[in-house]
């Protein structure tokens, strides 16, 4: 199977009602699917945390680096697997999880220079709870990270001029066509933003990058994913996103289905990220 077909299979398994409270069967199904996929490449660590007495789970796969680089700080890549009630959540965030699962395959079979830690986060839609718990745990363990990358909605693309919105005043600096993938990072990540963007453009997907100071507090929309708790604890972190509701009219709607996605775009994003992560110095 080629990459696009693999991504399509993941999407068809993950895109379903899976709110942790109102669609418990779907939520458990997706959790198990991720666990099974990860377990092909190594032992899966489960990070359990409680929310209102409910046990929630982040799923973690550690992949070692190529031979001589085992001691380097890991690159953490995360994607949330929960969804809001009433939507199959194809773009939000089956796309991010599908790419996470394929990057697991790529880097398990051909390791990167850095060790990788792949994390499927729970409870993002309830206030970034899974990533906040995990970031706090790493911080407490004094675990350094080379970079944290949050995969947040990677599959919606619209090449009609005027299809892309921005929080003001960003519209003055960025294109009004929603056909690019955005990389948003704290100031520590500027070199990585430039380099990852370049790798994504190389595979033919337009890419724009935005560095934000002060933990993104000025433009709050930059904080709406699992990278934000890492920013707050001083880690270098980047969100990769199709910009969600600033572009995708199906955001948090029943219509956020696989048919609304652009699979060529999603596949390109996945390829570009793989190449980009391999090129990080």
Regions found by a protein language model. Name each.
Residues 66-74:
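Proline/glycine-enriched tight loop/beta-turn segments at coil->beta junctions
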Residues 2, 6-9, 13, 25, ...:
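Extracytoplasmic/secreted proteins, especially bacterial periplasmic and envelope-associated proteins
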Residues 60, 75-78, 117-120, 146-151, ...:
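Structural recognition of the beta-strand scaffold that forms the well-ordered cores
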Residues 7-66, 210-211:
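A non-catalytic alpha/beta surface segment that caps or lines the substrate-entry region
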Residues 73-85:
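Glycine/charged-rich beta-loop-alpha catalytic/anionic-binding loops adjacent to active sites
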Residues 162, 166-281:
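Active-site-adjacent substrate-binding region
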Residues 84-194, 219-222:
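Acidic/histidine-rich catalytic neighborhood of metal-dependent amide-processing enzymes
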Residues 10-20, 79, 174-179, 253-254:
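Acidic/histidine-rich, surface-exposed loop or edge segments in extracytoplasmic proteins
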């Amino acid at each position: 199977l080629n990459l696009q077909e693999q991504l399509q299979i993941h999407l068809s398994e993950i895109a379903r009602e899976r709110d942790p409270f109102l669609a418990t069967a779907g939520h458990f199904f997706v959790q198990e699917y991720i666990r099974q996929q990860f377990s092909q490449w190594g032992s899966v660590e489960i990070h359990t945390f409680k929310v209102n007495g409910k046990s929630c789970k982040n799923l973690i796969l550690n992949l070692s680096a190529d031979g001589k680089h085992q001691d380097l700080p890991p690159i953490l890549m995360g994607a949330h697997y929960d969804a809001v009630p009433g939507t199959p959540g194809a773009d939000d965030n089956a796309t991010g999880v599908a790419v996470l699962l394929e990057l697991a395959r790529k880097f398990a079979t051909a390791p990167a220079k850095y060790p990788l830690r792949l994390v499927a986060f729970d409870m993002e839609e309830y206030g970034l709870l899974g990533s906040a718990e995990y970031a706090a745990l790493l911080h407490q363990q004094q675990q350094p990270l080379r970079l944290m990358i949050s995969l947040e909605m990677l599959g919606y693309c619209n090449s009609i001029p005027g299809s892309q919105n921005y929080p003001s005043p960003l519209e003055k600096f960025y294109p009004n066509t929603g056909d690019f993938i955005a990389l948003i990072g704290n100031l520590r990540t500027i070199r990585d933003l430039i380099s990852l963007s370049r790798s994504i453009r190389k595979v033919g997907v337009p890419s724009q990058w935005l560095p934000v100071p002060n933990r993104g507090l000025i433009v709050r929309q930059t904080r709406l994913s699992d990278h934000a708790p890492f920013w707050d604890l001083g880690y270098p972190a980047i969100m990769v996103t199709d910009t969600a509701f600033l572009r995708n009219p199906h955001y948090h709607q029943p219509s956020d289905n696989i048919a609304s996605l652009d699979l060529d775009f999603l596949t390109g994003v996945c390829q570009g990220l793989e190449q980009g992560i391999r090129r990080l110095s």
